[in-house]
C-alpha cells in the first residue's frame, strides 16, 4: 500500500512541475485567447 502512495505522490509532483514550467514559458504556438 505504501508503494501506491509513493507512486501517486511522485506522479503528482512531476505533473505539478511540468504544469508550472509549461505555463511559465511563453507558448510557442500563437493562441487566440491572449
From Swiss-Prot:
Membrane topology annotation: Single-pass membrane protein
Query: InterPro entries, per this entry?
Result: PSII_PsbT, PSII_PsbT_sf
Keyword annotations for this protein, in alphabetical order, are:
Chloroplast, Membrane, Photosynthesis, Photosystem II, Plastid, Thylakoid, Transmembrane, Transmembrane helix
Q: Where are the transmembrane segments?
A: 3-23
Q: Does the keyword Membrane feature in the UniProt annotation?
A: yes
Broad class of the protein's primary localization: plastid
Quote the Pfam families the UniProt record gives.
Answer: PsbT
Q: Which family does it belong to?
A: Belongs to the PsbT family.
Q: How does it assemble?
A: PSII is composed of 1 copy each of membrane proteins PsbA, PsbB, PsbC, PsbD, PsbE, PsbF, PsbH, PsbI, PsbJ, PsbK, PsbL, PsbM, PsbT, PsbY, PsbZ, Psb30/Ycf12, at least 3 peripheral proteins of the oxygen-evolving complex and a large number of cofactors. It forms dimeric complexes.
Could you identify this protein by its name? Photosystem II reaction center protein T
Q: What is the lineage of its organism?
A: Eukaryota, Viridiplantae, Streptophyta, Embryophyta, Tracheophyta
